[in-house]
Structures are given as structure tokens and as C-alpha cells.
Amino acid sequence: MSFPQLGYPQYLSAAGPGAYGGERPGVLAAAAAAAAAASSGRPGAAELGGGAGAAAVTSVLGMYAAAGPYAGAPNYSAFLPYAADLSLFSQMGSQYELKDNPGVHPATFAAHTAPAYYPYGQFQYGDPGRPKNATRESTSTLKAWLNEHRKNPYPTKGEKIMLAIITKMTLTQVSTWFANARRRLKKENKVTWGARSKDQEDGALFGSDTEGDPEKAEDDEEIDLESIDIDKIDEHDGDQSNEDDEDKAEAPHAPAAPSALARDQGSPLAAADVLKPQDSPLGLAKEAPEPGSTRLLSPGAAAGGLQGAPHGKPKIWSLAETATSPDGAPKASPPPPAGHPGAHGPSAGAPLQHPAFLPSHGLYTCHIGKFSNWTNSAFLAQGSLLNMRSFLGVGAPHAAPHGPHLPAPPPPQPPVAIAPGALNGDKASVRSSPTLPERDLVPRPDSPAQQLKSPFQPVRDNSLAPQEGTPRILAALPSA
């Protein structure tokens, strides 16, 4: 029998079944002798080579297909389709089932044949998603486009897609190449053009509204985060200045009525006004019959109606602050005489203060000089040490100013009814706070010295008792 598909017809023509039973060393020796005889060309080598060649081919193709060592193992018997018949025809299974039988070739040759034809996978030229290196031919097209657009080397999205198709490159590779080319041109100082921000350069990749229009693109380049913030602040300041002008125009007329009502009804503003010294021209200016004189003291400012424009006040105005402080910043500096050069405008040398820091503001309810009066009334029940002079009876001069206030009724009308012109500096200092009537409501004994002396004296004696006992103890120690 012959197997022409194996390429060995001359070796298997005269071979018989009895020739397959030789030992492996004898088979190898016979194969070597047959090869030597065929090379020398001696007569009789064909018959010798017939049996030896058949044994050699059988040993090569059927050495791993023998049923003896593999039939007993259950793992390998499943892979051998004719395990029972291979004992008689060991060469048949391997020769007819060359591709399917795992026993045909050893495990070292068990690799699949497909990778030999397509070494990079199922695609003939590799994965198409893998970016390919840019060659000199592909970059020459990009260089030609760059030379034509030296003034504006920013290709649009459509141009990038066209160049990517021509050069067989990806869109990212084209964009990166142009970015590097622009960087090289800037380093070489060969060309200068309007610089673009990175956001706009990335926006050109996905298409922008300013593509192909360099003038519009340059206008957009001037807008960045810092300029946007500054522009917004400038616009906001412009709106604030317009609102400030309106507030300044309405300010002289609006607080006039609340100031008059405050003096009549005894609000905290009235008590704060009493604390001011009355010898300054400001106190006389309150009784002036001209309308708006409480706010505008200079004739030039009264005629103009905008007294706060030249002042260095903050731009943010508070309507509540303007309403609660009718005698605000313009009263901080006394008005110059009529013949003075600064009569028609504010003096440049006079320091301007914010209304919150003026004595007339509602926050300053307690005068600094009368802080002791506040503490005496607040801590009277606790027996504060601040009242020690009144406890000991030494505070006769201190209690004298409080004499007129003891029979005074609780309502706040009596301190408000006093005219500003009738008060002098001493009486104004007595009026310490808008909560002055509340201090009078505190129950005060008629003779604090007589009533509070008796509980205070034992405390003093008790404090002296340990001092007298200490010398006795110290004297007894040396004697012991």
C-alpha cells in the first residue's frame, strides 16, 4: 500500500505488516544504513531501503500514537479516537488523521497554524485601531499645508480630517503634529502670529464658531478668566456709582423727618445727641431755620445737592445706616467760615470718619466716661467691688449727681424734654446712655451706707482675724 499524500511512495511500496515490529535501536540503525546505501548507489540498496524506510516512517509518525502507554490513562484515552484498533494498526490512525489526531505530532508541534499566516491577529496588517508611525511621506503633506498657511497655522476641523485621510494618520496625530510644528516655528522665530489659548486650540479640534475667521478669533483671544472678572467688577462698580448718586441725591431729604421725630419721641438718637458737646457750631446749626441744614452745612453743598460725591466714603451704602444716623459724616468736621476758601467744598485736611465710628451712631449707646455708672447699676445686686465707695458711705460726691434721678418716673420723657441749648457740658456728661431710665428702675436703698455697713463690717473683721492668728502660730513653732 502506498500513501502518495505523505510524499513517501517508494518507502512504503514493499513494506509489510511484519516490518513494523522492530525495536527502536534496530529501526534507527536500519534507517541509517538505508540512507548510506541510497547515497552510495550500490546494487541491492532498494530492497534494503524498502523495509528500513517503512520502519523509519512508521517510527516517526507512530511513535506517540501507540496504544500501550496511553490506553490505560483515562485522560489520554478520550483524545485517541481509535485506541482499541491502534494496537494492530498503529500507523493507520496517524496517517489518515493527520490534522485531527493529537498523537500525530508531539506536543512541541501542537501550535495552531493560523498565527503563521497572520502574526498580528485576524487583521493582515495589524490592529487598525493602533496608531501608525508618521512617515516622511505623510508629514510632507502636512508641511506643504503649513507652508501655505504660515500666517494662520491653525487648521480647522474639516482640514484636519482631510489631512488625516490623505496622510492615513489619526486626527489626534495630525493635531499633535501641528502643535509641535507651531512650537518649532516659535522657537526658530521664523514667523509670528497671534497666540491662542489652549482652550481655543482644543476647541478648534472639535470645531468652533470662529473657524476660518482669524479676526474674530483674535477678539476671542483677548477674553480670559482674569479679564472677565475685571470687566464684571468694573460694570458692577458702574452700577454701584449710579445707585450711589441716586442715594446721595435723596439722602438730604429722607433722614430729615426721622431726625425730628427722634428728638421728640426720645429715641436712642436723642440721648446720643445729648452726649455731644454743645459749644461746637454743630449744635447751633441744628436750630437753623433753613431746610436740610442738618445734613448740608456748607452753602455750596446745599446748592449742589450731592454732598457725598467728593468724600472718600465706601461705595456700598446701607439704607438702614443712613436712616439711623441722620447726623452722619458731614457733621464730623465743623463748617468753615463764610469767607474761608473752603466754604464751598469740604476741607481736604480734615479727616473723614465712617458714620459707624461717630459718637452719634446708634451703636455707641454707652459713653466711655460713664462706664462705671453702667457697671454699678448692672452689678448692684451682686455686691460688686465697684460700689465699695457707696457701700462705705464715702461716695457722697458720687451719689450727689444721682439725686435728681431718684424721684424721676420710669418713662423716658423727662430727659428728652430738656432743650439742647439749656444743657452744659457737665449735665451732658451725666446723661450717659439711652437706657438711663432703666438704671433708675433698679431698686436703690435711700441710705446704702447705713444698711450695707453692718453686713460689710463682719466681713472685714473676719478677714483680719486670720492675720492676728498667724503671729501666734509662728510664735508657737519656735517654742515647740
From Swiss-Prot:
GO cellular component, one term: nucleus
Pfam families, per the entry: Homeobox_KN (PF05920)
Gene Ontology molecular function: DNA-binding transcription factor activity, RNA polymerase II-specific; DNA-binding transcription repressor activity, RNA polymerase II-specific; RNA polymerase II cis-regulatory region sequence-specific DNA binding; sequence-specific DNA binding; sequence-specific double-stranded DNA binding
Composition bias, Low complexity: 252-262, 340-351
DNA-binding region: 125-188
Keyword DNA-binding: yes
Primary location recorded for the protein, binned into one broad class: nucleus
Subcellular location(s) per record: Nucleus
Highest taxon of the lineage: Eukaryota
SMART domains according to UniProt: HOX (SM00389), IRO (SM00548)
Sites of Phosphoserine modification: 241
Stretches with biased composition (Pro residues): 404-417
Keywords, in A-Z order: DNA-binding, Homeobox, Nucleus, Phosphoprotein
BP-aspect Gene Ontology terms: cell development; negative regulation of transcription by RNA polymerase II; neuron differentiation; positive regulation of gene expression; proximal/distal pattern formation involved in metanephric nephron development; regulation of transcription by RNA polymerase II; specification of loop of Henle identity
Bias type Basic and acidic residues, positions: 229-239
CDD domains with a match to the protein in the record: homeodomain
Region (Disordered): 190-268, 280-354, 401-480
Protein family (similarity comment): Belongs to the TALE/IRO homeobox family.
The protein's name: Iroquois-class homeodomain protein IRX-1
Gene, per the UniProt record: IRX1
